[in-house]
Swiss-Prot record:
This is Calmodulin-beta. CDD domains: EFh (cd00051). Ca(2+) 1 binds at residues 10, 12, 14, 16, 21. This protein has four functional calcium-binding sites. Arbacia punctulata has two distinct calmodulins isotypes: alpha and beta. Residues 1-32, 33-68, 70-105, 106-138 form the EF-hand domain. Keywords: Calcium, Metal-binding, Repeat. It comes from Arbacia punctulata (Punctuate sea urchin). Belongs to the calmodulin family. GO terms for cellular component: myosin II complex. InterPro entries: CALM/Myosin/TropC-like, EF-hand-dom_pair, EF_Hand_1_Ca_BS, EF_hand_dom. Ca(2+) 4 binds at residues 119, 121, 123, 125, 130. SMART domains: EFh. The lineage of its organism: Eukaryota, Metazoa, Echinodermata, Eleutherozoa, Echinozoa. GO terms for molecular function: calcium ion binding.
């Protein structure tokens, strides 16, 4: 997957991509780096500072980025699965199901408490931001 994406943006086939193309490559792989993050990643791997990145450097960079975002993406996917109507909210019952499927062994009381804490406006539903905050707070 990475080699195909890399090759797509290695226009002249010389084994390097320009830093300008990096953002496009990463977005095609489902990443969404900020400009600052792109510059940081480029600086980390572009040893000679010539503005191009070879494939081994690219793999190193993607491995770092994906390790950072893996758990967040897993949470995002879990949220999508149980947000049945795709409206950006999950119900309390759906949340209970999500927690069970993520391997959390919680009592009903514990789940109810999490729902109360996460459900800021008290409408019985939890939006994505609230869900992520709940799942990542320990």
């Amino acid at each position: 997957e990475f080699k195909e994406a890399f090759s797509l943006f290695d226009k002249d086939g010389d084994g390097t991509i320009t830093t300008k193309e990096l953002g496009t490559v990463m977005r095609s792989l489902g990443q969404n780096p900020t400009e600052a993050e792109l510059q940081d990643m480029i600086n980390e791997v572009d040893a000679d500072g010539n503005g191009t990145i070879d494939f081994p450097e690219f793999l190193t960079m993607m491995a770092r980025k994906m390790k950072e975002t893996d758990s967040e993406e897993e949470i995002r996917e879990a949220f999508r699965v149980f947000d049945k109507d795709g409206n950006g909210f999950i119900s309390a019952a759906e949340l209970r199901h999500v927690m069970t499927n993520l391997g959390e062994k919680l009592t009903d009381e514990e789940v109810d408490e999490m729902i109360r804490e996460a459900d800021i406006d008290g409408d019985g539903q939890v939006n994505y931001e609230e869900f992520v905050a709940m799942m990542t707070s320990k």
